[in-house]
Amino acid sequence: MNSNKEETTADGSVSTTEEQQQQQQPQQQEQINTTTASTTSNGENTASDNNNNSNNNNNNNTNNTNTNNNCDISMTEDNSKEEDTGIKVIGEGELWGKLISLNPTYPTIEIRQDSIILGRSKGVCNYTFTSPTVSGKHCKIYRDPTVKSRNVAFVDDTSTNGTFINNEVIGKGSKILIENGCEISVIPKKGSEKISFIYQDCFEEQKEMEQGGPQQKYDLREVLGTGNFASVRLGVEKETGNKYAIKIIDKKKMSMTSKRKDSLMDEVNVLTKVKHQNIISIKEVFETQKNLYLVLELVTGGELFDKIVSERKFQEDTCRYILKQLCDSVRYLHSNGIAHRDLKPENILLATPNSFLLKISDFGLSRAMDEGTYMKTMCGTPQYVAPEILTKGEREGYGKSVDLWSIGVITYILLCGFPPFGDPQTKDFFEKIKNGGFSFPSPYWDEISDEAKSLIKNLIKVDVEKRFTIDQALNHPWFTNHEEKTKEFYEKDKLEFPPPSTNDDHQPTPNTTSSNSQLVPESKCDQIQDNTTDNNNNNNNNNNNNNNNNNNNTTNNSNNIDNNNGNDESKSSKKRQLSEDSNINDEHEQKKVKN
């Protein structure tokens, strides 16, 4: 039990304090990528817990049931029964919903009556628990009996400490419409105290299975993440017990025309053939009238984005290992005619929580989206968008080069902990991208090598013809001069070190002589950017010295953000945090103008 103060409420449940409730609140992922196999931190732990359960029950093909008979549950005698399989059946009518338990202590519930009540009060609740933090009548799950063609189901929250849907609290006295695959949590804690279920709409599942969905072969369990037009659920292969991430793409929400549906399937067919040690693999594909299902390799390390927020910045050797993997996987895609076009830390996954072994996801499907959907996805994370995406009206006008721009931005963030173009909320943010207006402010970049700065300057280049290709990036001295150290990282993670890259001839040899040279020759933002070239570096150095004292306050603010970086932050608050850090660049630009 948590050491925080508790109090007993009128209904007999133990009420947690506001501080404790905040600690219980799991992370909410604001946006998911179109083919990501990532999990939220809460989803990772759930997947890990369930993995142990699955291994113990591989001989039992009914993976969505738990056979533990020592359940801390009692049922009312008149409307429920327990079957030998470990399933609790409530009611005697048509099976319309299931609650698949995510904790082996509790069984799966089959709902055969219009409503059930969960809580602690025996004789009142259909499904009871003994935990003191559960209310007498905690929540009610019910469907609208007047709708016959489909299920319209709700959860009423009648609890003191909260009922949660996909890690979001409903609120006492409120109700919410639930959909197939929602996670309903009575106690959202991790581990043995967790009381959570996946709601399975039996009508929807049966319909999808009859149309060729994966339900015949896989048990679809908890939601690992949701987004604008897709969700990811943990899938357990019934025959083997192996776990996968099943990406469910809603074709209607993706605004699929007939032509684009064909394009989507063409892209998927190409992606199923992609095989690379740093790219999420697609095991198989299912399609129904409503959804496209991608069965993906499951990784448990979360997103690189979360690692950036927690670690703030990385040593150059670590960055080099991360970028070497990223660039090698992008080179593989480009050599096979595939442009990722949405590279960002949210789409770069970690194979395990304690390593930097990368797995990139969400590649190749952007061409199947309509223009509005694609731009909506891009604008959700504008820090990584190449200028040609903002200036060209048709996506056919750009391709592989946008990946190199994104790699440059990612490299910048990994090395210093904040993005190059400032806060996206500022009015001139997109103009900075279009004009390549960024800098290497002191003191944050003082200890970072000129080689790293040179690579970034050749990647974040507005002129596409002058921007590095992926082969040129891999042949840059920042990589080639430090291969022995990078190989040690590869050996530690048991990865095959990539072969040498073939250099392109049409782009200039990288210049590593000065970190203070003009960043973007074609820049239109001279009033924001340094008005210096290699011939007046002394002037530039004086400006940097003047800025050092002024930047102390910014450093203190950044440290305060570090101290407040808790594990319970939501995805949106983490993005706001990264935006706050980006003000370092905004303040630096203003100071340069004054100087």
Curated annotation (Swiss-Prot):
KW Kinase (keyword) present? yes
Bias class Basic and acidic residues marks the residues at 585-595
SUPFAM superfamilies, per the entry:
Protein kinase-like (PK-like), SMAD/FHA domain
What's its EC?
Answer: 2.7.11.1
Listed under GO biological process in this entry are:
DNA damage checkpoint signaling; DNA damage response; mitotic DNA damage checkpoint signaling
Q: Where is the signal peptide?
A: none
Family matches, as PANTHER family: SERINE/THREONINE-PROTEIN KINASE
Protein name (database record): Probable serine/threonine-protein kinase fhkC
Gene source species: Dictyostelium discoideum
Which lineage?
A: Eukaryota, Amoebozoa, Evosea, Eumycetozoa, Dictyostelia
